[in-house]
Every structure is written in C-alpha cells, then in structure tokens.
Amino acid sequence: MFDQSMTSEALTVTTVTAQDQITQKPLRDSVKASLKNYLGQLNGQEVNDLYELVLAEVEQPLLDMIMQHTRGNQTKAANMMGINRGTLRKKLKKYGMN
C-alpha cells in the first residue's frame, strides 16, 4: 500500500549532464521551468485551456505508469490515485487507454 506520509518531495526528476554529473530536482521545478519556457514563447498570443493542457501532459503518463504498476487492475489503480474506479475509467477512456 502507498505510504500516505510521503510528500511531493518523492517526485523528482533525475538528469545526467554531459560531464556525467547527476542532479535531482523536484518534479514541480521541471513543470515550472516548462511553463516558463512555454509562456515565454507565446509572443503575446492569447492562451486558452492552459490548465487542461498541463493536466493532460501529466495525467496521461501518470495513468499509464499506474496501470502498468497495478498490472491493469483498475480497482488498485483507483485506490492508489485516490479516485473512484468510475473516475479512473473515464480518464482511461479520455486518453484511449481502455
């Protein structure tokens, strides 16, 4: 069972530089940097549905990895994610993962 005491600090991104230096930083830092880059490239263009865009970029790989981890067991996957199974099924269908 998932340890509820774990914080978002457990979600890190590991990178290896050309000089073989390994760095780890929180996932939120990578998301923030990606958003800063995206917003910097807009050149004054209007943006709609940014929230949905970001969620889709995170949600789909999350669903994929959780379903792999639970070997396709939707009940376990839903419990792990803290959502009900019906919601999980809708999300899987949304991304064509059913």
UniProtKB/Swiss-Prot annotation:
Keyword Isomerase assigned: no
Single GO molecular function: sequence-specific DNA binding
Source organism, top-level taxon: Bacteria
Pfam families for the chain: HTH_8
Keywords tagged on the record: Activator, DNA-binding, Transcription, Transcription regulation
InterPro entries: Fis_DNA-bd, Homeodomain-like_sf, HTH_Fis, Trans_regulatory_Fis
Residues of the DNA-binding region: 74-93
Family, per entry: Belongs to the transcriptional regulatory Fis family.
Subunit structure, as described in the record: Homodimer.
PANTHER family linked to this entry: DNA-BINDING PROTEIN FIS (PTHR47918:SF1)
Entry function: Activates ribosomal RNA transcription. Plays a direct role in upstream activation of rRNA promoters.
UniProt protein name: DNA-binding protein Fis
Gene that this sequence comes from: fis
